Each structure stands twice: as structure tokens, then as C-alpha cells.
Amino acid sequence: PPAAAANLGPDAQARFINLKAWRAEVAREHNLPAYVIFHDATLAAIAERNPASLDDLQGISGMGAKKLEAYGAEVLRVCQQG
């Protein structure tokens, strides 16, 4: 796994992989590099926290208000699908 995800437990690893797949899709749709959506470290932090609400996403490094608004609901959906 990437360094960002090296310390994650098995459930968080699975969420991280799902989040990376989702990010790749979004990046393709918007014709952006993946890191512009979220860095690996941000995805790893999200995977570790396993957010259940938008409030849970606040305060994660790399998750600003704009990204929370743009991607928050999708990120929660991806985390819940595992």
C-alpha cells in the first residue's frame, strides 16, 4: 500500500482503496489530476476516521469547506459502502 495507508487496519485499508477508486473516477470526469481532488494522506485520514457525517469530515487535514461542500456527501457514501 502507499506510505499514507501503511498504518491503517484492514477495514480502513478497504475504505482507502474504495476512496482511491472514487477519486480516480472524479478526476477523470473533471479532467484533473487525482491529487487535486484529495492527496493520499487526506484519503488515509478519512479512511481511518470512518466518518458517519459531514461533521466527522471537518477538521481532517486537506478537507476544506469547498471540498467538504463539493465532495463530502460522496466521500461519506464511499465510506459507508464497505
Where are these regions (language model features)?
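Accessory DNA-binding and partner-docking regions appended to nucleic-acid-acting proteins
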Residues: P1-G82
